[in-house]
Amino acid sequence: MTNEIKFSIIVVSYRKHNELKCLLYSLLSQSYQNFEIIIVHDGIDSEHQMMMNEFLDDNRIIYFQTPKRFNDWGMTLRNIGLDIASGDFIINTNDDNYYTPNCLQEIYDVVQKESECNFVYFDSVDKNFQWQNEQQQPYSLFKPKLKRLHIDMGQFAAKKDLIGDIRFKIDYVADGIFIEEILHGMNPFYIEKILFIHN
């Protein structure tokens, strides 16, 4: 792949105003700038809308609120984002996570070198020092594994063609199921660097 690629970053959100600001600042500060940010808020919230108004002059940001609240772990919201995403690679994340400034550039560099790569995953740290109910040292490193419950949804970028028509089930463990469903066509590459901060 020699052309510049576009990322679609799908953000599911529910009333985390300050946290979402941190995420947006981390994305808008990326060294690689060819992306769109799709923010889907779960239900109508005027305060959330007011907070978002300061960002909506940037035409890379697509923002809307669903007419009703789904309260289904963000799965319906992720599917809405997937349906409108126009990028070559998709990143799904939550409104309280954030990324290092070089994250998209690192992924882009891999995709340029590895022409068959359609799934890029990377290391993360947990700001709250816990992972899967186990106490960790401050900013412990979490090496992802490609199986259910061992990789966070925000910890990888998948090619849109790989995802195809696959969508999230409305289920608590739907993140893991989604990854398992795209595994069969996956040609992954692992970046051994911390690019994602999980909250």
Residue ranges of predicted features:
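Conserved donor NDP-sugar-binding/catalytic core segment of glycosyltransferases
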Residues: 104-134
